[in-house]
């Protein structure tokens, strides 16, 4: 081709940025030929910033090196001379010819013809290796095909597991498995696992499913997939077919499994363990015995459990996690003799093994409108009645109380639905007799557990309760140990189910002080020795997350609940009291980046995000943790529509015709709906004309924020932050515990007060290096340390000795930290107890100079708190 023809070629008229895009889909041989014909494009490719082209180029270089390192001795085998090798090799090196020789041998054994291999052919290879008794090697000799045998497992059990695996499939995976043919039950299972690995996210679930049936076959299957995926990927690279992200990801994940198999990861490593952790690892249990571990925040319970499992390689262990994220994280950490699952996952598998349920029956949610429809509540509670009698409840409101009653049963250890599951408030709101409300609830339960009735979904708590009520084979019986992590977050139903496994050695791990899911039925009953006694008890008190500054405030909170065990920190940290803890004070509050603010409520989180989006410089990124932002902003826009008399568009609000109807529903609902509660709490803002524009500006600011990981503000609620940690944490201003002498004396018996303390404890223990308290918590700490530790009690003679009665004037703040200092003679306030509590003494009538300070009964508390603020916190601003 002449130079004139070259320059008249259409390629030269293409935009330059298109050239790297074209090369992404060419083989190396084609690219080399392309550059030889158009040498000027070499410079364009070298200077390209196209990430896909760079990735392609890098992968090809890595592949070449891998082929060279993994090649056998130089030479050409007989099978390397077939047309496939000659037609696709990118060079004539002995290493590459040998590689293609070996790949042809693999294809021959798998019953595949020589030539470029596609991903879908792996399914044929699996079925061939499982179903054929004999196959043929590359020399034509008959060899035994004894791959992937699963011995001593009934075919019925394999079929049920296969059904369970396929129930998790996405539509794409279902279509893929339907296109593959299997001749045996084992082949069908392996093909299902293969499709799951290829299409679904939960890789370790599919691998562990096979591992629990046959560890040898699972390892053999992993090696096979690693080899066959390498062949497929190489064939794709040599042809014009682009590498899909699914294929690249699958290759990497399978290779990671093999790497874990080959690594000495399962060897126990007690080096670096604390003495408390070693006691857990070395604890010996007999069948039926229970070890309880009280693990405070950040004390390394996961590492202790990991080494516990590694030190028992011959035992079958079940690790029960609270949620899917924790389960998936555990699957990456624990050895292969550990089955990781959630309680709902175990129940789900058990139910599906017994019945082939349609997808409609397996929906995860049951809305109030669906319940009302199932029970025909619209007929019993029509809208017309509410117009004539405003006190008449709506069908949706009654449905919420029926579901609340059913939830109390499903979360309990009870065997039958009864009057004990009906709350007094439900009877008051619904205006139903307890017999009628119980009848509605029983009918709903019967519809849910009727496997043939698809209109009432079998929600997760329902199949969990079924597992509790009925014995299912082979769910727990095959395990020697059960590790029950985050036990404080499980419902009594789940805890009781674990404790009934008398054949196993049970390890209960958690922190009762982090029980903050009371609205889900959790009550930390696993740590109640009266209900569930243990054989042995151990503690983890040494926190690797923070130091003694944070630990001091954590211990203060726990002491309010009567906790005697002290938490100790090992890191360097600081706790600060900010005189201007308003997050809008950029210069004062945000001295450390990245910076996380934890709030008690969603309302305060949204309000602060709106304020910060205006007050913070645009260079400082702002982010709301999780999916809260999108949901909240959509709800609030729809809530604004409702507040201004318009028909709301959001599905959760569309059934309300007016704000008044919505308000009545929220106030009288059986359980708080966090999303509806947010709209209700934001009522003042929603009625404002300017709110929507401020909300839009905030959302735009959040979307425009690009956090580089080193400089930004993260906003979260305490519930969202559980299990996470950050260097710098600030408590939001909505943490405002309001205690008096009566409420302090009731902390031990009040579930509400205990959970409020738990939420605050969770929030402040997220800090690793710096914790910034708000004003209210700081004052509460001063109040407790100076006074309230004697609230409700009588001072003993020993406690009245000088230096032992720490009242407010004995406490100062130095560098934002509290310390006790015995004041100089003449300044220590000694009072005459006269068998009264210190609280009553301080806020009661005192003698001497204090008479001028205390004016009258109604002003005592107000003036006393003002005095505390002036005396204790004034030095901060000096």
Swiss-Prot record:
Q: What is this protein called?
A: F-box DNA helicase protein 1
Q: Which GO terms describe its cellular component?
A: cytosol; nuclear SCF ubiquitin ligase complex; nucleus; single-stranded DNA-dependent ATP-dependent DNA helicase complex
List the GO molecular function terms.
3'-5' DNA helicase activity; ATP binding; ATP hydrolysis activity; single-stranded 3'-5' DNA helicase activity; single-stranded DNA binding; ubiquitin-like ligase-substrate adaptor activity
The record's note on quaternary structure and interaction partners says: Part of the E3 ubiquitin ligase Skp1-Cullin-1-F-box (SCF) complex. Interacts with skp1 and ssb1.
- Which terms does the UniProt entry file under GO BP? DNA recombination; double-strand break repair via homologous recombination; mitotic recombination-dependent replication fork processing; protein ubiquitination; regulation of DNA recombination; replication fork processing; resolution of meiotic recombination intermediates; SCF-dependent proteasomal ubiquitin-dependent protein catabolic process
Please give the catalytic activity noted in the UniProt record: Couples ATP hydrolysis with the unwinding of duplex DNA by translocating in the 3'-5' direction; ATP + H2O = ADP + phosphate + H(+)
- Pathway linked to the protein: Protein modification; protein ubiquitination
The encoding gene is fbh1
Family affiliation: Belongs to the helicase family. UvrD subfamily.
Keywords (alphabetical) are: ATP-binding, Cytoplasm, DNA damage, DNA repair, DNA-binding, Helicase, Hydrolase, Isomerase, Magnesium, Manganese, Nucleotide-binding, Nucleus, Ubl conjugation pathway
What organism is the protein native to? Schizosaccharomyces pombe (strain 972 / ATCC 24843) (Fission yeast)
Q: Where is the F-box domain?
A: 8-56
Q: Report the subcellular localization.
A: Cytoplasm; Nucleus
Q: What is its EC number?
A: 5.6.2.4
Q: What is the effect of changing residue 485 to N?
A: Prevents DNA helicase activity
């Amino acid at each position: 081709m002449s130079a004139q023809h070259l320059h008249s070629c259409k390629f030269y008229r293409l935009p330059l940025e298109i050239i790297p895009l074209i090369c992404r889909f060419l083989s190396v041989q084609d690219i080399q030929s392309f550059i030889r014909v158009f040498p000027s494009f070499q410079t364009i490719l070298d200077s390209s910033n196209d990430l896909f082209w760079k990735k392609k180029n890098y992968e090809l270089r890595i592949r070449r090196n891998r082929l060279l390192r993994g090649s056998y001795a130089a030479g050409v085998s007989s099978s390397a001379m077939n047309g496939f090798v000659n037609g696709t090799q990118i060079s004539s090196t002995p290493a590459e010819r040998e590689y293609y020789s070996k790949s042809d041998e693999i294809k021959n054994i798998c019953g595949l013809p020589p030539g470029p291999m596609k991903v879908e052919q792996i399914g044929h290879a699996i079925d061939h290796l499982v179903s054929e008794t004999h196959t043929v090697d590359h020399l034509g000799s008959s060899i035994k095909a004894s791959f992937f045998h699963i011995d001593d497992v009934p075919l019925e059990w394999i079929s049920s597991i296969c059904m369970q695996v396929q129930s998790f499939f996405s539509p794409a995976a279902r279509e893929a498995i339907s296109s593959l043919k299997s001749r045996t039950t084992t082949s069908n299972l392996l093909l299902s696992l293969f499709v799951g690995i290829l299409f679904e996210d939960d890789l370790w679930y599919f691998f562990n499913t096979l591992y629990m049936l046959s560890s040898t076959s699972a390892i053999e299957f992993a090696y096979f997939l690693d080899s066959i995926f390498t062949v497929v990927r190489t064939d794709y690279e040599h042809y014009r077919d682009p590498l899909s992200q699914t294929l690249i990801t699958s290759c990497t994940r399978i290779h990671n499994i093999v790497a874990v198999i080959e690594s000495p990861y399962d060897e126990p490593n007690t080096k670096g363990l604390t003495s408390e952790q070693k006691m857990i690892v070395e604890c010996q249990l007999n069948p039926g015995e229970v070890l309880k571990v009280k693990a405070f925040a950040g004390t390394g319970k996961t590492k202790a459990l990991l080494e516990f499992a590694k030190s028992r390689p011959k035992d079958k262990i079940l690790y029960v996690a609270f949620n899917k994220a924790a389960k998936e994280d555990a699957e990456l950490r624990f050895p292969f003799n550990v089955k990781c699952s959630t309680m709902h996952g175990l129940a789900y598998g058990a139910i599906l093994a017994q019945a082939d349920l349609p997808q409609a029956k397996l929906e995860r949610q049951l809305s109030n409108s669906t319940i009302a429809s199932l029970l025909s509540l619209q007929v019993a509670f029509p809208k017309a009645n509410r117009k004539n009698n405003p006190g008449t409840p709506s069908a949706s409101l009654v449905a919420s109380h029926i579901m609340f009653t059913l939830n109390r049963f499903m979360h309990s250890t009870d065997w039958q639905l009864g009057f004990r599951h009906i709350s007094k408030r439900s009877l008051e709101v619904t205006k139903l007799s307890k017999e009628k409300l119980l009848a509605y609830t029983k009918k709903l339960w019967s519809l849910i557990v009727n496997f043939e009735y698809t209109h009432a979904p079998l929600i997760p708590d329902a199949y969990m309760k079924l597992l509790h009520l009925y014995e299912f084979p082979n769910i727990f019986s095959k395990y020697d140990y059960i590790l029950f992590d985050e036990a404080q977050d499980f419902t009594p139903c789940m805890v009781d189910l674990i404790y009934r496994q008398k054949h196993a050695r049970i390890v209960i791990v958690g922190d009762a002080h982090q029980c903050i899911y009371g609205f889900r039925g959790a009550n930390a009953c696993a740590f109640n020795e009266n209900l569930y006694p243990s054989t042995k008890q151990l503690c983890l008190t040494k926190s690797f997350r923070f130091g003694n500054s944070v630990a001091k405030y954590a211990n203060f909170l726990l002491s309010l609940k009567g906790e005697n065990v002290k938490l100790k920190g090992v890191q360097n940290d600081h706790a600060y009291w900010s005189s201007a803890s308003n997050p809008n004070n950029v210069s004062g509050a945000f001295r450390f980046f990245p910076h996380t603010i934890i709030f008690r409520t969603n309302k305060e989180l949204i309000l602060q995000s709106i304020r910060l989006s205006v007050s913070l410089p645009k260079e400082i990124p702002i982010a709301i943790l999780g999916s809260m932002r999108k949901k909240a902003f959509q709800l609030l826009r729809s809530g604004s529509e409702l507040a201004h008399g318009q028909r709301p568009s959001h599905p959760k609000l569309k059934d309300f015709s007016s704000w008044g109807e919505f308000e009545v529903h929220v106030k009288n609902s059986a359980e708080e709906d966090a999303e509806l509660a947010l709209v209700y709490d934001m009522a003042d803002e929603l009625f404002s004309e300017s709110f929507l524009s401020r909300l839009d500006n905030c959302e735009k600011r959040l979307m425009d924020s690009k956090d580089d990981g080193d400089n930004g503000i993260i906003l979260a609620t305490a519930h969202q932050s559980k299990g996470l940690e950050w260097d710098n944490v600030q408590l939001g201003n909505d943490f405002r515990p309001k205690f008096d002498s009566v409420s302090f004396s009731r902390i031990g018996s009040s579930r509400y007060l205990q959970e409020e303390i738990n939420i605050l404890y969770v929030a402040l223990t997220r800090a690793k290096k710096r914790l910034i308290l708000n004003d209210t918590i700081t004052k509460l700490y001063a109040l407790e340390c100076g006074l309230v530790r004697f609230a409700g009690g009588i001072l003993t003679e020993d406690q009245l000795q000088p230096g032992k009665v720490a009242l407010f004037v004995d406490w100062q703040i130095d560098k934002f930290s509290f310390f006790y200092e015995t004041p100089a003679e003449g300044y220590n306030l000694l009072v005459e107890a006269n068998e009264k509590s210190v609280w009553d003494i301080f806020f009661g009538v005192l003698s001497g100079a204090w008479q001028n300070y205390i004016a009258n009964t109604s002003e005592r508390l107000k003036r006393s708190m003002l005095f505390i603020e002036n005396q204790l916190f004034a030095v901060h601003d000096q």
